[in-house]
């Protein structure tokens, strides 16, 4: 089974926030951890706290082309942004965009016309766009309808917030957006949204089942956001899906754990078989 993590962060600077461990998480460290967990490859989402993270992502994908690909970010309000979008796929390992509008100076992009020029260019490029967060998701329905050939990926279960008592708060329309064939969902970061739970995080199982019923296994992508998981090992994040969800068929698991993502992003890594995973 090809196992591709739909989201990790790699960085070599020291700007990381506490919930990501603060110290750098390098490509070499990730490869060793992936081998131990039985993970073949991963999509790196360069962290926005590090202004130089796209550079490190390109370097990492160049050194390990069968282990890492990248959904990079860019400042859409810069004059050079349209040309960068047009040339995005020419960068080694760059297979998509990730737009969250999380910074204060980005929050107007969905309504000030910025996304109106970006999305047609992204659609023309053929590269998927990962969208997430409370400033972006309210506009997904409009964008999915306006740009039927744009592959949209919802970040982290379609999350718009998180609280200690409610855990994961999804956008209320996440399930209904499944009617758009160009919308998919990353099942990433789950254990971090179940901090009061423990492996196998049964509080998440019903959410996963509802997304499965809505989207099917062809539009769901397993992932971890591993540097944020303090209550779960990488191997446990794998086995939660491969061993603890009995309603998934073997074909479902093959799709959700990597095959569906490979098709959606048109990325076919061919890594050597990872080392045998350690017991969880």
Task: List where the protein language model places each region.
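Glycine-rich phosphate-binding "P-loop"
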Residues: 12-24, 45, 95-110
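Active-site gating/metal-coordination segments in enzymes
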Residues: 51-135, 142-144, 186, 190, ...
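Alpha-helical scaffold segments that flank or form the walls of functional sites
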Residues: 19-45, 53-63, 86
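Conserved, mostly hydrophobic/aromatic
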Residues: 7, 34, 57, 97, ...
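Hydrophobic faces of well-ordered beta-strands that scaffold small-molecule active sites
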Residues: 3-8, 42-44, 70-72, 95-99, ...
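Catalytic pocket-lining loop regions of alpha/beta-barrel enzymes
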Residues: 108-221, 269-280
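Mid-to-C-terminal alpha-helical segments outside catalytic/metal-binding sites
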Residues: 1-6, 23-41, 210, 214-221, ...
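Catalytic metal-binding/acid-base residues of hydrolase active sites
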Residues: 9, 48, 158, 190-191, ...
């Amino acid at each position: 089974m090809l196992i591709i993590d739909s989201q990790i962060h790699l960085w070599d600077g020291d700007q990381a926030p506490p919930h990501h461990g603060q110290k750098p998480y390098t490509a070499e460290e990730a490869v060793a951890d992936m081998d131990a967990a039985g993970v073949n490859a991963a999509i790196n989402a360069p962290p926005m706290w590090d202004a130089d993270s796209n550079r490190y992502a390109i370097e990492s994908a160049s050194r390990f082309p069968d282990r890492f690909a990248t959904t990079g970010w860019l400042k859409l309000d810069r004059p050079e942004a349209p040309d960068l979008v047009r040339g995005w796929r020419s960068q080694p390992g760059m297979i998509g965009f990730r737009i969250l509008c999380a910074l204060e100076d980005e929050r107007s992009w969905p309504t000030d016309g910025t996304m109106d020029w970006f999305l047609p260019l992204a659609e023309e490029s053929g590269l998927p766009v990962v969208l997430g967060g409370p400033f972006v998701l309210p506009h997904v329905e409009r964008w999915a309808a306006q740009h039927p050939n744009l592959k949209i990926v919802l970040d982290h279960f379609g999350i718009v917030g998180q609280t200690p008592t409610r855990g994961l708060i999804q956008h209320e329309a996440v399930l209904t957006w499944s009617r758009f064939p160009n919308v998919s969902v990353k099942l990433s970061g789950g254990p971090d949204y179940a901090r009061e739970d423990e492996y196998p995080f049964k509080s998440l199982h019903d959410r996963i089942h509802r997304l499965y019923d809505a989207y099917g296994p062809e539009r769901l992508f397993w992932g971890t956001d591993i540097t944020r998981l303090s209550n779960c090992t990488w191997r446990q994040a794998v086995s939660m899906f491969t061993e603890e969800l009995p309603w998934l068929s073997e074909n479902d698991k093959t799709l959700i754990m990597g095959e569906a993502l490979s098709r959606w992003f048109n990325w076919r890594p061919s890594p050597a078989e990872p080392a045998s995973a350690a017991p969880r």
